[in-house]
From Swiss-Prot:
Originating gene: murG
Subcellular location: Cell inner membrane
Designated name of the protein: UDP-N-acetylglucosamine--N-acetylmuramyl-(pentapeptide) pyrophosphoryl-undecaprenol N-acetylglucosamine transferase
InterPro entries found in the cross-reference section: GlcNAc_MurG (IPR006009), Glyco_trans_28_C (IPR007235), GlycoTrans_28_N (IPR004276)
Pathway listed: Cell wall biogenesis; peptidoglycan biosynthesis
Top EC class for this record: transferase
UniProt keyword annotations, A-Z: Cell cycle, Cell division, Cell inner membrane, Cell membrane, Cell shape, Cell wall biogenesis/degradation, Glycosyltransferase, Membrane, Peptidoglycan synthesis, Transferase
GO molecular function, one term: undecaprenyldiphospho-muramoylpentapeptide beta-N-acetylglucosaminyltransferase activity
Length: 382
């Protein structure tokens, strides 16, 4: 049985796409080893059929501390990769994979890079010269070295299986309506919507660990303004929020007499995606690929501190394709967000167009990348 190594950081944005790829490779008969860091421990499910290895690399801005840590991590990675003896390693970028990628270079293990964002990250750019192939999610990726362009293969992003199963739900702006005054607002076709939510326009808000605090202040304020402008709106709000913020948020929504669900973490995002008419979120690659796959439109507020400002480029690319909306954090206000939400509710055809444009980008990334890996293994390239 041939062995394949996946190297990915321990945050959900890197971890879940790598797991989805691993599951596909296991189905194809490979023994899959997953090298990651300590942050992923809350996600690890031993029933996935993957063999996990924790190889932590402590980040430090002090070069005199980082280099010794990196050297130790590389030696550990060399020992690990030597024992595994894999046919290929797939790197998903981010600093935790550096040691594994250096080890692969040293041991001459064929390297494939997967770039999820529309901007090639520093780690992936560094190892691009050693890679056999570079798989990308977007047709247009910034920061690509000229020499790397011949290695590029567009595979699309990789989406978790439970999200891919939502493919049967059709987004339609002309099926069900909700009434706001005398205006009829169209709603998406959703076979799982419950009778009590039949006429509610549902907004799903999540920001991850780096977005929840901002959203806990911005979103309720926006909804208050929205309800002042349109008191008859029938809304359903699903919002991720830190425990410390939930009392305040629930109090605001209760006083507005709107339906809401507020939680610190959603274990199964598919359930929330099923209910949503529009999403408000950060613009991480994993989030964008999931929304793209199911054609669910979103208002993106990119995280300004994201490496290389990649979230802005992700969101702006979709906005340019009329497949989403990008509102920069430095320029946003509760009033501007309320106006954008009201515009979308009042013009459902805009939502439907965005959904169609998202679906035009969809690819079966887990299949295409697995095919690419097999091509490198069985038909080696220079």
């Amino acid at each position: 049985m041939k062995k394949i190594i996946l190297a990915a950081g321990g945050t959900g944005g890197h971890f879940f796409p790598a797991v989805a790829l691993g599951e596909e490779l296991v189905k194809r008969g490979y023994e899959v080893h997953f090298i990651t860091d300590l942050r992923c421990q809350k996600y690890i499910n031993q029933n996935l059929g993957l063999i996990f290895h924790i190889l932590d690399l402590k980040r430090s801005s002090n070069i005199f501390l980082f280099l010794p840590n990196l050297s130790i991590a590389i030696l550990k990675a060399i020992k690990l990769l030597y024992n595994i003896r894999s046919s290929a390693i797939i790197g998903f970028g981010s600093y935790p994979v550096i040691s594994s990628m250096f080890a692969a270079v040293f041991l001459r293990v064929p390297i494939i890079i997967h770039e999820q964002n529309s901007y090639l990250g520093k780690v992936n750019k560094f190892f691009a010269s050693f890679a056999k192939r570079i798989a990308i999610s977007y047709e247009e990726v910034k920061n690509l070295p000229e020499f790397a362009k011949s290695k590029i293969v567009v595979t699309g992003g990789i989406v978790r299986e439970n999200i891919r199963e939502l493919d049967s739900i059709v987004y339609s702006a002309s099926h069900r309506g909700l009434i706001t005054g005398s205006k009829k607002i169209k709603k998406r076709l959703d076979s799982v919507v419950t009778p009590q939510n039949d006429k509610l326009f549902t907004i799903f808000i999540f920001g991850g660990s780096q977005g929840a605090t901002l959203f806990s202040e911005l979103i309720p304020a926006s909804i208050q303004i929205l309800m002042q402008k349109q008191p008859n709106l029938k809304l359903n709000i699903i919002q991720q929020a830190a425990l410390d913020d939930q009392v305040k948020i629930k109090d605001i929504y209760s006083k507005l007499n709107i339906n809401y669900e507020c939680a610190e973490f959603f274990d199964n995002m598919a359930l929330q995606y099923k209910e949503a008419d529009v999403v408000i979120s950060r613009a991480g690659a994993s989030t964008i690929e999931e929304l793209t796959y199911i054609g669910l439109p979103a208002i993106f507020i990119p995280l300004p501190s994201a490496a290389d400002n990649h979230q802005y480029y992700n969101a702006k690319l979709l906005e340019d394709k009329k497949a989403g909306w990008c509102l920069e954090q430095s320029d946003i206000s509760a009033g501007k967000l309320a106006d954008k939400i009201l515009d979308l509710i009042s013009n459902p055809k805009i939502l439907e167009e965005a959904s169609k444009n998202l679906l035009k980008r969809r690819k079966e990334g887990h299949v295409l990348l697995s095919d690419l890996i097999e091509g490198v293994i069985y038909h080696p390239v220079a």
